[in-house]
Structures are given as structure tokens and as C-alpha cells.
Regions:
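Peripheral, non-AAA+ core regions of ATP-driven protein-machinery
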Residues: 1-147
Length: 147
């Protein structure tokens, strides 16, 4: 059973479902974990409504970390919608997300490759402080961030 809490909208709930499906398909030898155990996904600040597909890659990475026992490298932040085939798809609000990452002290941010043109809208002082890494697939992301 999958439980989802944190005042999430329908699109974000779908992102959790897609993340679970992707992880099951990428780690078939671990699929029985989902049959034998419940999964509870909570996105903090429970009273604040959250929605949209941008956390898809982050949710997928978190669930892959749980299943594999590999930690996520703390130097990374990431944003991107994911498809059921594992493609990292573009998101909106990239300048604001990169500014927030920089303010939080993050050094590396994974973004959808299809959002590279949006970097023109990002302030130079933000870009100078971040290593911005375009990615196309879930596999690329997991190879970079799971240790």
C-alpha cells in the first residue's frame, strides 16, 4: 500500500505513483519490497498545498535510495518531471528554483536538458554559484546522485 501525505494535489500524487512504477521497473529484483511493505511518502509543511510535476525526479530518487540502500549525495538538488519511460521532462519556474537552491547552499543542481534554454532567464550571480547539470534520463540522475 502507498500512503501519500502533505496536502498534495492530484498531479503530485501522480508523480509519486510514476516514481514507484519507475523504481519497480529499474530494480525488478527489489519489487517484492513493495508487496511486503507499505510505502509512506510525506512532503513536509503539511498545511501548505503542493502540486505540479517538478518533484518527479526527486521522488523517484528518494524511492530508489530507499530500495537500494544507497544514500543520496547531499550536494545535489534536482527538478524535473519524469515519464513512465524514465525520461526527465521540462518544468516551469526554473529561475526561481535555481535561486532557492543557491540560497540553500546547494552546489549542484540537476535540471531537465530541455530546460537549458531557460538558463538565459537566470541571473548570472546565481549561475556562477551553481554547477547546473542538464539530464535526460532517470538513469543519468541515479548514477550521479546515489552513493
Amino acid at each position: 500500500k502507498i500512503q501519500i501525505t502533505g496536502l498534495l494535489g492530484d498531479v503530485m500524487k501522480e508523480s509519486v505513483q510514476i516514481a514507484v512504477t519507475l523504481v519497480k521497473s529499474r530494480y525488478p529484483e527489489k519489487a517484492d519490497l513493495f508487496e511486503k511493505n507499505d510505502l509512506h511518502v510525506h512532503v513536509p509543511a503539511g498545511a501548505v498545498p503542493k502540486d505540479g510535476p517538478s518533484a518527479g525526479i526527486t521522488l523517484t530518487t528518494a524511492i530508489a535510495s530507499l530500495v537500494t540502500g544507497k544514500a543520496v549525495s547531499p550536494e545535489y538538488a534536482m527538478t524535473g518531471e519524469v515519464s513512465l519511460r524514465g525520461r526527465v521532462m521540462p518544468i516551469g519556474g526554473l529561475p526561481e528554483k535555481l535561486m532557492a537552491a543557491q540560497r540553500a547552499g546547494i552546489s549542484r543542481v540537476l535540471i531537465p536538458a530541455e530546460n537549458v534554454d531557460d538558463l538565459d532567464e537566470v541571473a548570472d550571480e546565481v549561475k556562477e554559484k551553481l554547477k547546473i547539470i542538464p539530464v535526460k534520463t532517470v538513469e543519468e540522475v541515479l548514477k550521479k546522485v546515489l552513493k
